[in-house]
Amino acid sequence: MLRFQTAGESHGEALVATLTGVPAGLPIDQAFLDRELWRRQQGFGRGGRMKIERDTAHILSGVHHGKTIGSPIAILIRNNDWKNWQESLPVEEGDSAKHKPVKSPRPGHADLAGALKYNFPEARYVLERASARETTARVAAGAIAKLLLRQIGADVLSHVIAVGTARLENTEVQWEKLVELAQRDNVLLGCVDPEAEQRMKEQVDQVLRTGDTVGGVFEVVAHNLPPGLGTYVEWDRRLDGLLAMAVMSLQAVKAVEIGEGVSVAATFGSGAQDEIGYEREHESKFTGFTRTSNHAGGIEGGVSNGQDILVRGYLKPISTLRRPLGSVDFATREPLKAAYERSDVCVVPAAGIAAEAMVAITLAGCALEKFGGDSLVEFKRNYEGYCQQLQSF
């Protein structure tokens, strides 16, 4: 069983991720982990925080001599901005006069609901943990999950489909385009089509001028996974349900779509399914079964079917505005503009990277459930045996 947790606050000393259940013997590429963290920081419309942080994964346990040892992996990512918050957010009891309270909750954020739930007089501690800065730790854990998936020839990448009303017209993107996109060192908005990306940039430029924010849509693609991950026999093990929960857990994601789930709801059954064929002479490592389309997004009945798995996340515009909306003062209950905290304008590309991590962790967990193995050797041997079973079906 693969489990992960994160800890840390936005302006605390560091963020921590723990990952339990990774087989022993998995090679860990430090440069790859740091590259994934770098990818999360990119994109036009990010705020000033990204100029401060230089995220690097410091592995504290579970890895020696470049390979996992089967014990829990702990990863630490330091917050450079902590030096500016040490006195206002001390671990021990400090000078309350240096505390920076969030006096008026921001509509759309966790501020008010969190303060009510945990009985805080204001929202500083809610903001610190609810912040999307937490996804840094998720991306670090997701990088290790990706390394495990790569051992069986699979990978997970993302691209941006829409920012505001600007949209990629042809969303059937070849895997090679996503690989090329992930290798770029100059990232604008994470779209494979330069013309569509410029239209998206215009949307961000507009909200930069007006003090607003903008949301959008990203798509995560999981490539070259075998059929048979997940199951239909129990509701809480269905793969599409697990992926939806994983992506929906990301800050500001308000809807999740598997495949063409939204558009097929407006069509008829005869046009919504992916017809099945068979090639007796094929090069697939899995089976000779083929499909004419991928409306299902690679999942049928809660089980992967061997096609690319497609997961879309719909991101609302983030809640912190330079022109704040109406709110109330926590102390007086009188009208007061919502608090402003240094923030981003558009985070759709970064959300896509965080979603990659969540999808990779989910799929790696399903792969471990299917194939088992306390060591990488055992895991891969079981996978190869399953592939042989598929070939002889």
UniProtKB/Swiss-Prot annotation:
Pfam families in UniProt: Chorismate_synt
An annotated Gene Ontology molecular function: FMN binding
SUPFAM superfamilies, A to Z: Chorismate synthase, AroC
UniProt catalytic activity: 5-O-(1-carboxyvinyl)-3-phosphoshikimate = chorismate + phosphate
This enzyme's EC code(s): 4.2.3.5
Enzyme type, top EC level: lyase
The keyword Cell membrane appears for this protein: no
Family, per entry: Belongs to the chorismate synthase family.
Protein name stated in the entry: Chorismate synthase
